[in-house]
């Protein structure tokens, strides 16, 4: 198959457990660039949390951020897809935290708002590279559009214990899914990485069967199902692996290099 695009999740897939790029990923990315195969970052992160990785790998490809809510044809744009939650749904999600008492992180117009400035907020902000503002500084009722997404963060034990209940209590138009074991994300159910890839396919004239998707998390499943060929990182949850055509090495060993050696060069 003449593959033209590899769509990869970042955390738990592209990056190792320490949040770094495995050494063999740089050479693999350079090989893909030389062959004209787009390496597309598809992540729950906002654009600002992607730029260093994008630049380190010397990419020129489109970028999918916020679980598919925003799609850029390159790091400098243009923005070809942008979808947000409704304000009513957003207010409902905020109210859920009266039950769960987690730290809320909310993205609105590429600004990060947090319910309190504590360890959890600063840890999340550190990953994204954005300085957070307090949530009480914005009144969603007076905004023209809703937020892109929410992240509830706390201990692994708490997030694990509330995940299913939070999903049941969320509006039907909102998806609640863990993107890291200690991050529970809420976003519009019409948002998906698969939808984002379809926008890129249309813009670049790339067919689904020419796309490889790779991920490790539950929020990657729709992307794996969309692509012509699906790869799960070796560290993926067993349920995610059921959606894969190939099980690669773990994220610590360089998943993209594994795909290049075992699929692209074959």
Which residue stretches match the model-derived regions?
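Short active-site oxyanion
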Residues: 36-40, 60-61, 148-149, 209-210, ...
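Short, structured coil segments at secondary-structure junctions
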Residues: 57-59, 66-67, 75, 169-172, ...
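Active-site phosphate-binding/coordination module
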Residues: 18-121
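Asp-based phosphoryl-transfer active-site loop
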Residues: 2-18
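Conserved acidic, metal-coordinating active-site core of Asp-based
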Residues: 96, 100-214, 218-222, 235
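Mg2+-dependent phosphoryl-transfer enzymes with acidic/Ser/Thr/Gly-rich catalytic loops
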Residues: 1-5, 21-22, 185-266
């Amino acid at each position: 198959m003449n593959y033209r695009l590899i769509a990869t999740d970042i955390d738990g897939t592209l990056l190792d457990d320490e949040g770094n790029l495995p050494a063999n990923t740089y050479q693999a990315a350079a090989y893909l660039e030389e062959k004209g195969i787009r390496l597309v970052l598809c992540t729950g992160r906002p654009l600002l949390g992607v730029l260093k990785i994008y630049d380190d790998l010397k990419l020129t490809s489109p970028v999918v951020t916020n679980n598919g809510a925003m799609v850029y044809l390159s790091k400098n744009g243009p923005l070809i897809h942008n979808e947000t939650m409704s304000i009513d749904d957003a207010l409902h999600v905020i109210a859920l935290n009266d039950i769960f008492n987690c730290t809320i992180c909310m993205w609105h117009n590429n600004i990060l708002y947090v319910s309190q400035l504590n360890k959890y907020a600063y840890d999340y902000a550190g990953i994204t590279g954005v300085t957070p503002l307090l949530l009480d500084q914005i009144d969603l009722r007076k905004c023209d559009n809703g937020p892109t997404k929410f992240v509830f963060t706390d201990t692994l034990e708490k997030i694990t214990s509330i995940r299913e209940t939070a999903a049941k209590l969320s509006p039907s138009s909102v998806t609640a899914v863990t993107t890291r074991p200690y991050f529970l994300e809420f976003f519009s159910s019409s948002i998906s990485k698969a939808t984002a890839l379809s926008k890129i396919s249309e813009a670049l004239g790339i067919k689904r069967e020419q796309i490889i998707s790779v991920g490790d998390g539950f929020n990657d499943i729709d992307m794996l199902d969309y692509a012509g060929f699906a790869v799960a990182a070796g560290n993926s949850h067993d349920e995610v692996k059921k959606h894969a055509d190939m099980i690669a090495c773990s994220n610590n060993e360089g998943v993209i290099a594994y795909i290049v050696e075992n699929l692209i060069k074959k």
